[in-house]
Amino acid sequence: MERSVFFISDGTAITAEVVGHSVLSQFPLTTALYTLPFVESETRARAVREQINALYQQSGVRPLVFYSIVTPAVRHIIEESAGFCQDVVQALVGPLQQELGIAPDPVAHRTHGLTATNLSKYDARITAIDYTLAHDDGISLRNLDQAQIILLGVSRCGKTPTSLYLAMQYGIRAANYPFIADDMDNLSLPAALKAHQPKLFGLTIDPERLAAIRDERLSDSRYASLRQCRMEINEVESLFRNNNIRYLNSTNHSVEEIAAKIMDVLGMSRRMY
């Protein structure tokens, strides 16, 4: 049976989504998802409550509600709904208050809002995103000394999404460089990359998966053929081994998992933004 799931917040609803998805992933559910950010007024909260109640009346099954709301009056309206309501923050606040010995001082938008205390971190993240976009897919090999990581791999193995995730989530300046079909006859590591060997990290992928991804882009082409994909993967993995470049098979991993594994292998600190 499908369950309706609400992620509600007086801010971006990112926290409610992250926690809610993490919990829901433990169960084999089919879900209809509703994300409702910036529920800051009692009027908006009552409208949301009616939406939850209407879905309950239609299905006879309580919607699941993950919420994070600072204002008590607004929070209470959501809690009065017919949904199964779970405050994703308050469950931890009580025990933490006892441990710290101080009372919480909740402020709306503190987690993901822009404040004087996190402005420098925000600027660093924007700088990282700009750098990563300017050094995507081998566009530029200049200023690689400013890169914190340089991802290598064949076309369509996950370099670009991983680079952007590292920049957006952790403020890491990530460049990436592709090895294309024309490189394979005499594959070697460009001199500009050799100078930054400690920053290099390779991504590889199962040939069958690579062929399927490429076929969506250019079907029935040499580029997407299984034979071509196998050859490219073999050549690039050999290059990684010969140059002592650490690498990861991305086939069965999400972008989040790939990024976390890379940072762990390279010993990079995880600074959340």
UniProtKB/Swiss-Prot annotation:
This is Putative phosphoenolpyruvate synthase regulatory protein. It catalyses: [pyruvate, water dikinase] + ADP = [pyruvate, water dikinase]-phosphate + AMP + H(+); [pyruvate, water dikinase]-phosphate + phosphate + H(+) = [pyruvate, water dikinase] + diphosphate. Its EC number is 2.7.11.33, 2.7.4.28. Bifunctional serine/threonine kinase and phosphorylase involved in the regulation of the phosphoenolpyruvate synthase (PEPS) by catalyzing its phosphorylation/dephosphorylation. HAMAP family: PSRP. Pfam families: Kinase-PPPase (PF03618). InterPro entries: Kinase-pyrophosphorylase, PSRP. One of its GO terms (molecular function) is protein serine/threonine kinase activity. PANTHER family: PYRUVATE, PHOSPHATE DIKINASE REGULATORY PROTEIN 1, CHLOROPLASTIC. It comes from the Bacteria. It comes from Sodalis glossinidius (strain morsitans). Keywords: Kinase, Nucleotide-binding, Serine/threonine-protein kinase, Transferase. ADP binds at residues 153-160. The keyword Kinase applies. Belongs to the pyruvate, phosphate/water dikinase regulatory protein family. PSRP subfamily.
